[in-house]
């Protein structure tokens, strides 16, 4: 109840009270004597009760009326709001212009659909209805009552004129799943006889609508012109033009007969109308294949009627509401049956209608299948672009990690899920379009996404393989450096157990990591073009483990060898330095003693620490002889020039020193060849001893110095004549032995020449005649007097004489003789060279000509190397480098393996321990002694005895 009504009721009660008060006052004034006041009061009370009851009844009635008014107002507001929720727009104006982006003064059909997002998601689950009929026949009014739309209706005050211009469209229904099209009237006076626009909009509605509603007045039924049967003929002809396939959807034509005549049975009207329809159908020109086709092959016909809108409005509204129920899809008797659906996707309706109207307007042959195909292609391309852009945004995360050289975790799952998700999104929308086009476009989208995934897969696998290679490099080389460093400590086989466990852990960890990465990095929908690399890396990991195990065993054996060497070295070096003839017998004894003490420790280390089986242990123990030989060899070769020094010491000890170890004093006319050859022969025996490691007693009989049968002279041979040799026991090769012997030969000749000089000095000093001494004293008398007069020169002369006397006393007179001989043998040419070097008499001496240098000639154009014109395209290097399934088995070391994998990624490593130098590195040919100069050559020429002795030496040493 409203406030105004309450106020009026209160006012009425107050007025009644005032009236009662006035009645009481009047009654008291007019009260006559003898009147019973009790009766008066009783009457008064009864009247008041009656008045109160009447007031209450009136108030209740007013309250009911007010509530009813409120309910009607609320209902009107809800209906108004509901109508406002059903938007309408003009899709085609009276000029035939479609509502697209070119029209700035009204909303486009695409924007209209975009605003109604629920409609876009319907797919095929919507229906379209259009109404045709004469102008001002109440089409818009009927639609407004049936679907609660708000189409403009006729205002009779303005006269009968065109109300609906062009084609209007409304979106209605609880789910906004019904599109209503209100078409312009067909017999308007404005267009007169121009039926082209009427035909075009009819064709347009027929191509998109599943239900055509034909509005006909009841009094026009049976009249061809008045009932607008020509429009119906157009519909039949256009339908045959559009839908000629067997599977084309039917169209429902609903005839609504308006202003029904209550006196005339509806069945009679229906039969008359149906008879006219059949006549029109028979008169329609049909293709040959449809000459005898009945009308129900293309159309379903329904008939209904409504009473007069003005004369019987309440009944009209009531029957309109009943008719409205037939447009509810939930109703079993609904007009919107699935067989009538034109199967135009909701999200592509705007584009489809635009294309259809464009073809109709330009009077082109309207091919609906082609239009649907065009729509499908356009929408699918649009979908592909949007979905692929979203796809690229989502894979940016992978690209970011790849750019930072990181492997993307769960690459396979991510790519598979993303691919399936995007394909599902595409199919959810595109499946409503033409299957053939959808399949083609789905393949295109799939190809685009798989190309991107394939590129990412290439990067992922490259990073994964490089990551595993880095793990291999870091793990194995770090471990190798550790157990190589271990070799510098005391030999303890138990320490190698930890290295073996680490290697097993590395191998299992790398294998598991690689298996995890490889299985999680290969998407399901792409071709795995890394199968070769994956299989190669699998074998490469196994091969590196084999190399690592082998190197670890070799490291243990090498450590044992160094251990043996450290034990044997103090015992072997004295034997090698003595170089006795039974040296190798003593060496074998030392080796047997040291090996037997440590062999059990090595065997336990291989079994317990390295987990080697007995066969491999037995095999390694059998190879122990090689390690012993290497230990002996290392002991000898670790001292550069060891054998050369032994030979030189042996030669000097025999040839230059006496039994007490003092330098020999040569006697006049002493024969130097005998001690020389004896010393040389003993030194040669040392070379023969160290030519071969004789760990077998049978090897003692081998000799590497033989007599040349042709010349009868000694020669060094490659292999002994009295037996075969084991190349692993050869200490020096033939070239190395020849180099050692050549150096020894030069040293021996130098010592022999020095001995010859000493012997010659003694001979010259003893053969100087007295008269020569007196002659020199006589000729030098003035100088002698000058010396005696000069205290300085006299003191210097006395000092020199004292030094010479002292040297002569202690046995170094031969040095003085050598100096004197050297001074006497200096030639004038030497004097001239000395003067020239000192810069004396520069102007008198001839200037030596400087050698002319040949200037390098400039290269001409013809001299330049001609480059090849053909440029070969370099093949992209494999991720695995040069490693293949064929050459993996040939790998023998980590260096070889990682060199083949990638030279760029190979770590730069420095050797932890310098290798022992070979003997030949320090065995350069020894030059002649510094004293053996031109003067010595002249001296030898003046002494035929010396010359003949030297010639004998050279003949004996020829090979």
From Swiss-Prot:
Top EC group: hydrolase
Region (Disordered): 62-81, 849-868
Gene3D superfamilies recorded: P-loop containing nucleotide triphosphate hydrolases
One GO CC annotation: endoplasmic reticulum
Locations listed in the record: Endoplasmic reticulum membrane
Entry membrane topology: Multi-pass membrane protein
TM stretches of this protein: 768-788, 792-812
Record-linked HAMAP family: Sey1
Protein name: Protein SEY1 homolog 1
Organism: Entamoeba histolytica (strain ATCC 30459 / HM-1:IMSS / ABRM)
